[in-house]
Curated annotation (Swiss-Prot):
Belongs to the peptidase M20A family. DapE subfamily. It comes from Campylobacter curvus (strain 525.92). It comes from the Bacteria. PROSITE patterns: ARGE_DAPE_CPG2_1, ARGE_DAPE_CPG2_2. Its cofactor is Zn(2+); Co(2+). Pathway: Amino-acid biosynthesis; L-lysine biosynthesis via DAP pathway; LL-2,6-diaminopimelate from (S)-tetrahydrodipicolinate (succinylase route): step 3/3. This is Succinyl-diaminopimelate desuccinylase. Zn(2+) 2 binds at D95, E126, H339. InterPro entries: ArgE/DapE_CS, Bact_exopeptidase_dim_dom, DapE_proteobac, Peptidase_M20, Peptidase_M20_dimer, Peptidase_M20A. Pfam families: M20_dimer, Peptidase_M20. Binds 2 Zn(2+) or Co(2+) ions per subunit. Catalyzes the hydrolysis of N-succinyl-L,L-diaminopimelic acid (SDAP), forming succinate and LL-2,6-diaminopimelate (DAP), an intermediate involved in the bacterial biosynthesis of lysine and meso-diaminopimelic acid, an essential component of bacterial cell walls. The active site is at D66, E125 (proton acceptor). Transmembrane segments: none annotated.
Amino acid sequence: MDVVAFFTEILKFRSITPDDDGCLKFIAEFLGDFEARFIEKNGVKNLILSKRFGDGAHLAFAGHVDVVPPGEGWQSEPFTPLMKDGFIYARGAQDMKSGVAAFVCACRDAKNFNGRLTLILTSDEEGDALFGTLEALKILKERGELPQFAVVAEPTCTGVFGDTIKVGRRGSINGKILIRGVQGHVAYPEKCVNPVHQIAPLLSRIAGHDMDAGSEFFSPSKIVITDIRGGMEVCNVTPSELGIMFNVRNSDITSADDVKNYLQSVLEGLNFELSLKQSSKPFLTDKDSKIVRAMSKAVQKISGVAPQLNTKGGTSDARYLAEFGVKVVEFGVINDRIHAVDERAGVKEVERLYLVFKELIENFA
């Protein structure tokens, strides 16, 4: 079974997060000469596949088989792959069964590799992502089997296949500000403490504020306000409190404590509460590391495109690998239809992705 046929088969599994619908078992049977360990926790299924070829480097591939719900309006049944005009349409085609198919087949077919290959597969990435890759990594650490290097096959390319390798990701800090005032009649503003009036002159110092100037691989860590509300939707009563919700996609330059200290200085003198939660931490893999150099070389050889290295986008399971000290990069197909109606992946992209991963493995000395 070639990579396109295998890709088509795994697209048929209705693996809406966190249900793998039997997809992981199918993959384990496909790679029958790899040692398989199934891990299940809180209704989440994970699979670790491993094979030692020699005493060289330990390289891992990671991905998820779960997908988001398809929604309505598709031109075909979302879990019945449709091949049309050089594309395969199905939910999960780009995000990320194309990547899974490519590295599974590459691990099966690669020759002359002298290290250890591990595949980490989960059905919990599109949901809470608490009992998936993270749980598998805990077990690998307990067994002393953490990989040195890893590739997460998320769809990274934006315009043409081969244009982007992700070498890191920004972190995510969610925050809430509650400003307390004194409710009163609008005719007697001197008797009120109006939190709307208090925050108004300060908003320009919060909304869109860059916590840092950015760096070679990270854009500035910006405070983005997502919600402001207060009052009772009436015109004659001032509010007793006002709430603000915000997010900061932070680089490795700015920490949650930096955000806390800045906002406390801006809000000094007000009666306020501030809460922050770092839901994911930023990471950056050195551009001169072995995995970055090897991936860049493989991508350029197969695609003919010199890939750019960046950290744009949201979070992914690569953050967990980085937290465990694994040098990790991300590379996959074009991502223009992820989570969309009529999600699709180019047949030639999938074939070339397979060749990129095979090239990487065979030359990862």
